[in-house]
Swiss-Prot record:
Biased composition (Basic and acidic residues): 270-279, 1550-1562
Assembly information from the UniProt record: Part of the Tic complex.
Role, per record: Involved in protein precursor import into chloroplasts. May be part of an intermediate translocation complex acting as a protein-conducting channel at the inner envelope.
Annotated GO biological process: protein transport
PANTHER family with a match to the protein in the record: PROTEIN TIC 214, PROTEIN TIC 214-RELATED
This protein's UniProt keywords: Chloroplast, Membrane, Plastid, Plastid inner membrane, Protein transport, Transmembrane, Transmembrane helix, Transport
Main location: plastid
The protein's name: Protein TIC 214
Gene Ontology CC annotation, any one: chloroplast inner membrane
Family note: Belongs to the TIC214 family.
Native organism taxonomy: Eukaryota, Viridiplantae, Streptophyta, Embryophyta, Tracheophyta
TM segment ranges: 18-38, 64-84, 87-107, 124-144, 172-192, 222-242
Membrane topology: Multi-pass membrane protein
Amino acid sequence: MILKSFLLGNLLSLCMKIINSVVVVGLYYGFLTTFSIGPSYLFLLRARVMEEGTEKEVSATTGFITGQLMIFISIYYAPLHLAMGRPYTITVLGLPYLLFHFFWKNHKHFFDYGSTNLNSMRNFSIQSIFLNNFIFQLLNHFVLPSSTLIRLVNISMFRCNNKTLFVISSFVGWLIGHILFMKWVGLILFWIQRNRSIRSNPLIRSNKYLVSELRNFLSRMVNIFLFITCVYYLGRIPSPILTKKLKETSETEEGEENEDETNVEIEKFSEAKETKQEQKGSFAEEDSSLGSEEREDPNKLYGKKRKGYQENWKFEILKDKDLFWFEKPIVTLLFDYKRWDRPLRYIKNDRFANAVRNEMSQYFFHKCPVDGKQKISFTYPPSLSIFFEMIEKHLSLCTTEKLSPEDLYNHWVYTNEKKRCNLNNEFINRIEALNKGSLSMHVLEKRTRLYNDKNEQECLPRMYDPFLNGPYRGTIKKVYSHSILDASTTSTEDSLRVVWINKIDDILPTNYQEFEEKMDPFNGESLSTDINHSLASTSELAGESPMDFRFNLKEGLVLPAEQKQRRFDSENPMKYLKFLFDAITTDTPNYKTIQTKSIGIEEIGKKVPRWSYKLTNDLQQQERENEEESTEDHAIRSRKSKRVVIYTDNDKNPNTPISTNGNQAEEVALIRYSQQSDFRRDLIKGSRRAQRRKTVTWEIFQANVHSPLFLDRIDKTFFFSFDISGTINLAFRNWTEKGSEFKTSNSDEKETKEKEKKREDKKEENERIAIAETWDTIIFAQAIRGIMLVTQSILRKYIVLPSLIIAKNLVRMLLFQFPEWYEDLKEWNREMHVKCTYNGVQLSETEFPKDWLTDGIQIKILFPFCLKPWHRSKLRPHHRDPMKKKGKKDNFCFLTVWGMETELPFGSSRKRPSFFEPILKELEKKIRKAKKKYFLVLSVLKEWFRKVSKEKTRWIRKIVLFIKKIIKEFAKVNSILLFGRKKVYESNENKKDSITIISNKILSEPTIRIRSMDWTNYSLTEKKMKDLADRTTTIRNQIERITKEKRTIFLTPDRNGSPNETSCDDKRSESQKHIWQISKRRSAWFIRKWRYFIKIFSERIYIDIFLCAINIPRVNAQLFFESTKKILDKYIYNDQRKKEGIDETNPNKLISISKKYFSNISNKKSRIYWDLSSLSQAYLFYKLSQTQVINKYRLKSVLQYRDLFLRDRIRDYLGTRGIFDSKFKKLPNSGMGEWKNWLRGHYQYNLSQTRWSRLVSKKWRDRVNQHRTIQNKDYKRDSYEKDQFIHYEKQNDSVVNSLPSQKEKFQKHYRYDLFSYKYINYGVNYGDSKDSYRSPLQVNEDRGIPYNYNTPKSESVFVLGGIALSDYLEEKYIIDRGKSRDKKYLEWKILNFCLRKNIDIEAWTNINKNTKIGTNDYQIIDKKNPFYLTTYQEINPLNPKSFFFGRMGMNQGMLYRPIANLEPWFFSEFVPLYDAYKIKPWIIPIKLLLFNFEGNETISENKNINGNKKGELPISSNQKDYLELENRNQEEKEEFGQGNLGSDTQNQQKDVEKDYAKSDIKKRGKKRQSKSNKGAELQFFLKRYLLFQLRWDDPLNQRMMNNVKVYCLLLRLINPREIAISSIQRGEMRLDVMLIQKDLTLTELIKRGILIIEPVRLSIKWDGQFIMYQTIGISLVHKNKHQTNRRYREKRYVDENYFDGSIAQHGKMLVNRAENDYDLLVPENILSPRRRRELRILISFNSGNRNVVDRNLVFFNGNNVKNFGQFLDEDKHIDTDINKFIQFKLFLWPNYRLEDLACINRYWFDTNNGSRFSMLRIHMYPPRFGIG
């Protein structure tokens, strides 16, 4: 068994080895390549099928295999691969051969196949077959381009070591596959030859020449395929002929450009002390040095001719123009090797105008040391690797053998340990020095600063100091080359400068061509930092052998005699590198001056190669034309556009002096852009297009190309997406709640109609655009269309219409009517054919648009002539005026190509009013009149006949009745016995007769009446209905009477004498009948209503059984509510009497809710159904948490004994929240681990107010301290304000909606998410005054009212507040977009501008208005934070008309991120204001930001302010004039004047006075102000609001464009009055948009709503800091460290400069003041922050325990941390005791900090900065503390 398993294991391992071996992989790959069938197989199969002899077959196969072998060799041999992979290979070799072969084969008599000896190998045809197969195999990328196979090769080559074996095996694999394929083809051909069924086919047998025809057909097919291949390759190759040669930047231009740039740099970097001469020396020839600025590119660097010092320049490549044509290589003759061959975009830098050369890949693989191991970095700087290769070739430094990985790793560990020891020792020494009593200033580690001037000891500005500013780490300015020296310079002083030439010159090799392939010129200075850290210890590479490097002076370098040759030891490689790169030496004092002057700091950036072209686009070209520069055509493609001249000013102004271009007329032109999808924008002209596969465009205007694979991911149009759930909900709602059915249907109908209309309009517009674009794209279409339009216009005006007028008037004369020549000709003259541009801008009747044949034209017909059969006389009354006006509005049209009229260009043709329609109408009228007369006569006659007939019938009836009477009298004489039965019978008969007569009479009369009425003009249907109703009632009455009479007659048998009595049997039968009838009726009714019965029954069962379960907790809830209601009411009543603060009109929200609720519940007869099932516990406690701090002991019993409703956890939760006291008040540790407890203690994370304010969903203190709760009545959406359990109003028959809509669900989830967020962040939001974080600006120590109890929504996570952001963002998680009065909005529409001219903006932002109302707490006013600018305006809920203040107070909009990313050099004077707004954009009051602020001089008098004033601020009642300047001053007085400034009013006042001293502006009168406003407004607007985009609303834009179109026409007319009036009547020209007032101010424009200032669009992107602080916000629950509600301020006892302001903040920590045990100095602050971090990281690395080879080196052993965790476990609530806490903090200081957990900067550990993705390899720390 053991043996078997052993053998089996061996077999498996053997199999795995074989499968993974290079040979097998190669064979597999080779076999796959067989299926890459291309055009090369055409010739091979042709040779086989045509049967031209074995020699040809053999030569074809040999050529084919040789070609494939070449391809496989090219995989291994790089030069061959490069040669074949170039696009020019196809151009130079492939295409000419293809074309030659194609034309040769197509010409039959060009070569004769059979002329030479077949057996000769020299036969040209056999050689050609070989060549065909060989070359075509090389070009085999056709049917399957086999990109997958190429990738496979790359992967396999990367993996396997033995590359030769891989290539051979893959070739063998291909050969096997190829042989199999050819055998398969041979079998198929053999089968065709031998198949009897094919041969027995009569068609084949009868055709003798079938074989020869087949051969001809095959050769023809091969030629067709060959042609297709040629065409295909033509698309792929770069064309050598048709490329657009681009103009290179001339030397002079470049020189000028460089001069400009150097001037900029002088301004930026040089100090004021430097003289002009030194500047010249420092910055003159930057281009000449190798490692120059960003703008340096290979072509400029090596392509520019250097004058006078070519012999010194090692990389010199002469410019092409300096060589003769025969000296240039062939390829550069054919192709411009510096141009764009792929569709590259032109990336332009603002400072350096030439385009970036982006051929280079962003990935560059190279090995680099990472964590002591050599790893492959794929973002390694290529320049660095090239540089290392150069150094290796030139120096003996790196020639020794390299160290093993273990040695390297150990060395790395050793250096880290050494660093740690050094840091530890230094740290301990500093602490010991402190203990000995040294001054702290001497002990603290000082930051190294760069001096600007040693004598004056001025440091560099912080921005440019590399030691202070990370991103701005410095590079030292260039060393200077010979170009600085004049030829005549001989003095030694000048010659000393020559030392500073680029010392790297000498070590670079002279044979530059070796590096040409991967040349990427590097910038020595910028790379110095990279080299310093990448070559961490050059000794690792160089070994320990000492290196003797001699620096030879060449080419006229002068060195002072006293300076000796330098030696470099391997122990100090960095010194060597520094000497290489930096122009710094310490030997001679003479050099120091040069060195200090040449220091300049630059931001590190990626140095990119640039093209030598300076390209322009269309717009820049036009700008240059305006500047009268002669330039070539623009080289960058813009969007397809056409320039349309709309106005040419030919008037010469006599006052203006005659200039050179005075003859040229001034043109006003618009640019018309094509509406097609534009994928060529910003491409360089002549560049090849990318061959897109699997991409389609299916819309008229499509911004991006889409792949059909991802169609399901795209938001589809209406037709593809249909909201099924919405329709189902709609149906169910209508089914269950019938009452609201009609209302909803009406509103829905309206909405659907509007939507339909919009859709139709959109559809029509798209169709029009499509037609316009088709005309635009077809060649010569515009010319054809233009000519046709002009022809149609002439035909219409001068042929068709005059002939119609003549014909009409002739017919009138024939019909003996007056002709209307004058009227018709007047109307015909009025018709104007105005020539318009393609977009419809009107020009004039005679003037054609410029280039109208190419650009297109429209012809607009004003007052289009309409032929009428007659004209109305003017004397007729105008009773149809309104209709006429309606028709007159669209009194113009556009002419179509077919001579029709259309409303809009390219729209559908409109129906013209018919000529014959009024004639026919008139005829109809006359016929109707004649009919009326005729029918009137007829009806009179009929009436007369009817009357006569009536009389006759009456007379006959009377005679008949009289005769019957006589007969009756005779019958009475006879005896009863004899004639009894007969009498009854006769009477019955008579009755019958009489009935029939009566009924006939009744029936006949109405029919006659109806018939007679038919002829009149009454409404026939109404009459018929009436008559039918009368008829039915009369018939019913008759029938009833007859049945009664019959009953009385028939029920008179002998046994019952009296006719009025009935027998018992009859009664019984009658009652049975009656019951039967009732039951029948009832059953029918029951069958009809069965459906509803079942439904009601099921509903009853549902309500009785299922809702019973829901009602059980409701009882408890009711009891709970009643008890809380009593307690709360009592408490509030008491509280109101104690305190004045709470407003009587608005009691607490929860209480008002509960009052409403119980008042409704108590009303038994109320039909409202209260669905308390939606009242969740979470919601209830949310509401409770918003109440004022209630009397907790009263609630205690309720909250303890309602066990069904309240659980222990919730009771504890409420206890911790401070709503009531639990017996054992626990601290809420539910959401936190022990590490968070620890984290709480670190003052570094007691974040600044700004940071916290981003997390906290505050209602910015507007109303809390005024103790008001405003009911939000207007807020109609589903927010927290809408109390769920009130708004459930249902009818009796309705049930709980079984299909809640998606929206409701969404909102429900949203609300609970919000609640859970608040639960986690409750310390931030709602905690009581003792335990919770409170901003120092808003602490109420005495009263325990949480400052934001009136918080309907949290705005810090899901709802983006501020400017109603729904306009700018996707509607993702933003539901509550209705404007709540609690929200602050930035309303840009109604803002005014600050019009002060000369105000210091710092002072403007520095105005501190932190005056709180109603509190006695100290307010911090920090000089360094000028941003706590808050205004206090009460929003009066009883005055909804107060528009300005009613829009949410409007004073603090909430935004969560900076508005834009402007660089500081944009407007320098705007920087402080913008920065302030960027940091805290929601705090600056808008009124202060944008309105005129007149400094209030009286504020200094308000020093003794009564603190007991009411907290409500009055609003100026005159709301209409709130934008007027005078009222603003008054309002601001009120805002400043009222309120309690607390006990430190005077201190605060000083701050305020100080700030106001700067911006103290006296009041001006309105007149003076309005004068100065005009200039100041514009200036102010330009300076401050360019970061906002201006836009007007779309309707206004459209109206403006319409006006412009009319102006264009009016300008050209001699007498424009008539057209102007008519265009105003038509509504084409709008007067409200015209600028009639010339002095209309910006303020007015904004007030009118014409101009809207919008912020630049925001993106939904949380920045990293925000997320980080969110995380901290969750963990830091106890933030009472921030509460500074003592009446004192702790002194800052440490200098801020050395402690980064961190201890200053810490100094405010709440400590027991009785003991002077303030927070001790945290020892880590001795070190600088950078060294601090380094020490912490070194300590936590524990690098000794790592494995070197196999493991991923990112994890480490965390044993050394356990002792801290044990310490933590002892006391979970360590922060409750301050002294303990301080000790705890001191104990833990250096080890574990949040930034160490997340972002270890690998900068100190010699990691190459290029490997950006090493962030993925962050050290994953194990959990510090044993959680759980």
